Regions:
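Acyltransferase donor/substrate-recognition loop-hinge adjacent to the catalytic core
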Residues: 1-13
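Flexible, glycine-/basic-rich loop-and-beta segments that form/coincide
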Residues: 184-192
Length: 192
């Protein structure tokens, strides 16, 4: 497909058990990180134009601890522990390689930001107030997140969640967040 983003009739389809194998296969085959199970609470979408799958999104539990996000919110350890469930991680985003459409990725992110809170509420009985994502700096610039009004809050140290010896074994990632509620900081218990 090579349409202008404005000419694409975008829709998000929540992936059910019947579509899970296909979603996993696309991610395994075409996403640079491949397939790994998503952590904690999670939600997956196919992004379609009519019946054609253009892209895939995966959302899951937020990272337990990341200094740029925690500092941006104004969290201490106790408030993070109490309210982390209100942050959701955009853990996978894949526009399929044969899809060429300028501005499509930012349109998809904007659509997901509108749709996800109510879907999450329906499934998990609470409404998230902030999205986060991690963009590998050596591979990507985060242009689609910037164009969709996400906020860059800093970089990881390149340690990863399992690095207890400070060996810096994973790529540095840019941390981006997207408020889903204008009072997100108050609702998260942040202090500024």
């Amino acid at each position: 497909i090579s349409k202008k983003a404005g000419d694409v009739d975008l829709s998000l389809e929540l992936v059910d058990k019947g579509g899970l194998k296909l979603w996993n296969e696309f991610i395994d085959r075409y996403h640079y990180l491949g397939y790994n199970p998503l952590p904690g609470a999670q939600m997956r979408y196919f992004v379609k134009d009519q019946d054609e799958i253009l892209a895939l999104l995966g959302f899951s539990a937020a990272a337990w601890k990341t200094a740029p996000r925690d500092s941006f919110i104004g969290w201490d350890a106790q408030r993070r522990k109490q309210n982390l469930h209100l942050v959701v991680n955009n853990s996978r985003f894949l526009v399929l390689p044969w899809v060429q459409s300028k501005n499509l990725a930012s349109r998809i992110l904007a659509l997901a930001g509108k749709r996800l809170p109510s879907d999450w509420q329906d499934r998990y009985h609470y409404r998230p107030v902030l999205l986060e994502t991690f963009v590998e700096k050596e591979r990507f610039e985060g242009t689609c997140y910037k164009a969709a009004n996400w906020i860059y809050v800093g970089d990881t140290q390149g340690r990863g969640k399992l690095d207890i010896r400070h060996e810096h074994k994973v790529p540095v990632k840019a941390v981006w967040v997207y408020p889903l509620h204008r009072r997100y900081r108050d609702l998260l218990g942040g202090v500024r």
